[in-house]
Amino acid sequence: MEDTQYLAPREPYVRDFDAAVRAADGREVVLERTYFYPEGGGQPADRGTLDGIEVVDVQKVDGETVHTLADPPGFDAGDTVSAAVDDDFRTYSMRAHTASHVVYGAGRKLLGTHGYGGFDIAEDRIRLDFETDGDASLNPLTIQRMANEVVWESRPVDWYEMDADEAGAREDIVFNLGNDAAAADTVRIVEIEDWDVSACGGTHVRNTNEIGPVAVLDVSNPGAELVRVEYAVGERAIDEWIETQRNASRAAETLDTGVADLASRAESLRAENRSLEAENETLAERLLAARLTALSENTFTRNGREWVAGTVDGVGPNAVADRVGELTDGAADVVVLAGRDGSTFVVVATDGETDANDVVGEVTDEFGGGGGGQPTLAQGGGLDADPETVVASLRPD
């Protein structure tokens, strides 16, 4: 039987055709010839109709292209049907697939790698993965610039068959084929003039200018030795740019500046914020020091040991832990400080005679939460009580 999968890649601009039905089983239909593209190689299945019935899926099964319809058809094997491939979706898939070769060509030039890590066309974006030898990254603006240059240079796109052994011997050819295609005697080559040569079975445009604009949405490292580029093409790319411009305009209006000055304004605000954070940290340290001094003058005796217990405001447990040991150097044998940082916490420091973990355990047994640490310094958190109640529970009646 003739393998019908490659009619769409060979003649990707065909949208309407008539074909005889080879087999019909429920909602699944096989035609003698078809221009529907079955899902594969990262490209989604075509959409469209057979005799007006919606085609909801197209898959390659045992060498045949199987069309799954939304409803059981009224035709049988041997009948001739009128088929229509959804023009908008096929055109988008063609643009997206050729754009992947453009972006991949740019990535290879920047990364110096031939590694192909995967590809997928979704409705809102396209994903392309590069395999690398180690840590690597790509500048999204550089990739975007290079891709759009190839688009407006209107480079021809050609496809042809090549002997598989000859193709495999060429280092400049990238392979993006399934196991069956890769094992064939010949492979289909897609070539963008002076830019990229790949073995590929997808549908493509004839010239890069048909892709339209390319907008790089994100560059990430989803795994070891892998770089991922996500991008949009055509109308979707324009929509992304408009949304980016809209957000930039809103941000500029909020910051009372122009879009062109957003970066410098953001840097200025970050510097101001860091300065304020430093001032706040210094002030908090001073307040904590003053609070520790005041608490050191109010000791009490418990189990034959001198204790200090009190509350602190405006600081977290780590900041308290950094300073609480100062009071065990002479003011007290055991120091307990409670505060709030989302929930109530307690920090305990001792001179070693009393285990700080035992004190934290006493508090968490009564008020919940958990914690621990070293014999001379421990913390507890998630307490179901306010700091004042925690401190009061430790003082002798």
Label every model-predicted segment.
Residues 1-397:
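A glycine- and charged-residue-rich anion-binding loop/surface
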